[in-house]
Regions:
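Short pre-active-site segment immediately N-terminal to the catalytic Zn-binding motif
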Residues: 1-18, 83-86
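Secretory-pathway/luminal and periplasmic proteins that interact with or process carbohydrate-rich
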Residues: 27-28, 56-62, 118-125
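Acidic/histidine metal-binding catalytic segments
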Residues: 37-40, 44, 66-68, 103-113
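Extracytoplasmic and endomembrane cell-envelope/extracellular-matrix remodeling and assembly machinery
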Residues: 74, 78-79, 84-263, 286-289
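Membrane-active amphipathic alpha-helices enriched in small hydrophobic residues
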Residues: 44-59, 67-79
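Catalytic Zn2+-binding segment of zinc metalloproteases
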Residues: 14, 24-41, 59
Length: 291
């Protein structure tokens, strides 16, 4: 359900929280298991139409064959989308209940739906509702507006620490996914915020400017010595620059702070194995098992 594109597109932590609430609604509703049945049903309809269309073509009725095949594909698609629309509305309702129950605003979910609506390539009046991959966003937004009008938590702000985490997350993703030149334009050297320095460290690393990358990360670690993700990135920079042994203390420290992080444990195990040191092999195995 969650992916880097969504995390990059979300403009604030409230939007991510809203989407998480919505996706939790899918899980609570058992939609993951049901969606395969819907796919199977829609596929069966399309296959049946293809077989019938092939028979018509053999009989020399080409126009009829094409109509049967296209009609069958549309029927199958409509069947799947109709099922999806029901799921989406159910997940929205669950999200609103979850947010209300945890004293959080649904404003973020509403804002993210607005982003999705803006991304539609075709004006709503020209769209075929059955061909949309998402339910009619407008009706979902209307339901959310009604909820927010009656919720006691609609104006409840997102915790500042969560907003800070989201800014860091977006900065790191942007720096890894976008060209270095774009990262440096977006996170200028004059910007001394944590997220800007975080992004620049990644950009320097990608540009093989090891000294600048290490200096930037050292500064962040001086200010936040127990941040597991700063420790992890320092380890990654060293590891990917060929300094495998030097990376291990940082990965180890990161695991101590965040022992439940499977990704960090996996990175530590990888570094331990790459040293070719038999003394570290058992520790690497333990980390892989715990990951």
């Amino acid at each position: 359900f969650m992916n880097t594109g969504l995390l990059m597109e979300a403009k604030n932590a409230g939007q991510v929280i809203g989407v998480i609430a919505h996706e939790t609604g899918h899980i609570a509703g058992g939609h993951l298991s049901r969606i395969q049945a819907a796919l199977d049903k829609s596929s069966a309809q399309s296959i049946a139409a293809f077989i019938l269309g092939g028979a018509a073509a053999v009989l020399g009725q080409g126009d009829l064959a094409q109509a049967i095949i296209i009609g069958g594909q549309t029927l199958g698609t409509n069947s799947f989308l109709r099922f999806t629309r029901t799921q989406e509305n159910s997940a929205d309702q669950a999200a609103m209940r979850l947010l209300e129950g945890t004293h959080q605003s649904a404003q973020g979910l509403y804002e993210f739906m607005a982003i999705l609506e803006e991304q539609e390539l075709v004006s709503p009046q020209y769209q075929d509702a059955y061909m949309r991959t998402h339910p009619v966003t407008r009706s979902r937004m209307t339901a959310l507006r009604a909820h927010m009008a009656n919720s006691a938590y609609s104006r409840t702000p997102v915790a500042p620490e969560l907003q800070a985490i989201h800014r860091r997350l977006r900065a790191k993703l942007y720096a890894f996914l976008e060209p270095t030149s774009r990262t440096m334009r977006r996170y200028k050297k004059s910007d001394r915020s944590i997220e800007a320095r975080y992004a620049r460290a990644v950009a320097y690393h990608k540009s093989a400017k090891l000294d600048k990358a290490l200096k930037t990360m050292s500064g962040l670690l001086t200010e936040h010595p127990k941040d597991p993700y700063f420790l992890e990135l320092m380890g990654q920079i060293l590891f990917e620059s060929g300094r495998v042994r030097d990376s291990i203390p940082y990965y180890t420290a990161a695991v101590k702070v965040a022992p439940s992080s499977a990704l960090i444990r996996g990175e530590l195990a990888h570094a331990q194995i790459e040293t070719n040191n038999p003394a570290l092999l058992q520790s690497a195995i333990s980390n892989l098992r715990a990951a």
